[in-house]
Amino acid sequence: MKRKAIKQWLLGLATFSAFVRFVGAQGVPPYTNAITDWNIHTETAMSPPPVNLPFVDPDFGSSMVRATDRTTNFKNPGSWLRTSASGEANMWSADNSKFYVIGEGGVDLAFGFNPSTMAISSLPGATPGQALHVPLRPEASFSFVDPDLLYGTTSSSPLTISSYRFSSGVLAPVLDTTTCGTQPPLVAGNRLVVSDDDVNVSADDARISISEGGKQSGSDMFVTVYDKTLGCRWYNTQTGQIGGQWGPTGLASTTETYLIRHAYLSRSGNYVQILDDQHLGFFVWDIATLNVTNCSLSGSDFCGAYGVVGHSSYVNGAGYIENMNILKRPLNNLSQFAQLVSPLPSPPVFGNELHLTWNNVDSSDSLPVCGSTYWPGENWLEYGITQAFEQEIFCVETDGVASTIWRFAHNRATWQDPYFNTQPLGNVSKDGRFFLFTSGWDGQLGPDSKGNPLSDVWIVKLQ
């Protein structure tokens, strides 16, 4: 894959060079202690440290702590634990005093956290020494305003958006989406119709989104957005019909029909990114209008690789030329993208997976986007680290002043397909100071009783 990448780089350089713009001096540095060179930092061998004992990454110097081990998931002992699948869910409370992880069996397990000492603790209501089992499905999202509040859905009422308040332990309905007037109607109690678990919330807590209507993920056809003042608004991706209690009604501007894999609300609350399940790329719905725009997998918009929604922008890997070729584009003009890393590393490396998270985004989309990179297990074992930014946790400058990459740690993850939990998917806190990620620690955690690879959740301090 690496030799092939060099050829792709030479062929594509002229095409892509028109979009390179971020050069020059570094802007205001948010991470003054981080390494920002582009040198190769090989990985120092290290045994998995014990849980809840802070340590220092030997290669980049960042403070870290192991958050989970085989005993953490008391609902399913000896099983894997992981972070959110997308980087879009907000797994940190607004004040960094709490976070949650996902355990095998679809359980949400929440902990207390001391940002000063990185000490992990049990929350009120939990058995001492254990996590608190939160009665929401995976991919729940903390409020960006209220650190006591977590939004999601339950297995028993998947068409109802609920909130969980930690101080009282109360689970309360926020919206029964069957009352939103979708066409055709969603029917409460119909066990053949569920929602995805992708509940997202705007930065001001005013809007919440969900995708729903199918039998399972990938078969949904409704995106429903709830405005706490105005009410519901919905879009049926199979018929193209848009309706609700506010805004214009009628047919979406796109003629494409498709089923939904996931849908993610922008932090502004004005847009929803919709991942289709028919490999058409993704769509963006301008919620207050009938405008739905496709960012196609084909063509020159480079929309195919993993990405993340910000306030009013979208950042994604280009999936072209080089692994660190990361693009930023406004959600209201998807073909107008800028290259965040310039010049690109040379010689180029292509084939590394790149996942991003941007829960720290501000209203101008100018704060760093963070992420992790990883190779498939067989490639990692064959090549090891041969290029800068491989198997790392990092953040990238997005303000247009420069192309700084802040480097924090090796993630020590070995992706073993098809075991999703072996990917080092990350989740950054609202203040951009902590990064939660999944790792099997170079395979040293071993297998479970069925022979499947284990993984745990780790925290690195970004400073």
Predicted regions, residues:
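Structural signature of eukaryotic scaffold interfaces centered on beta-propeller domains
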Residues: 82-95, 131-147, 191-204, 253-268, ...
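Blade/loop signatures of beta-propeller domains
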Residues: 33-70
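Asp-box/WD-like beta-propeller blade repeats and closely related beta-sheet repeat scaffolds
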Residues: 125-215, 236-249
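Beta-propeller domains
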Residues: 55-83, 88-95, 100-129
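Hydrophobic beta-strand positions that form the internal "hydrophobic ladder"
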Residues: 99, 150, 208, 272, ...
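Blade-level signature of beta-propeller repeat domains, shared across WD40, Kelch, NHL, RCC1
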Residues: 420-463
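Structural motif
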Residues: 106-113, 157-165, 215-225, 278-286, ...
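Loop/turn-rich, solvent-exposed surfaces of beta-rich toroidal or solenoidal domains
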Residues: 321-327, 338-413
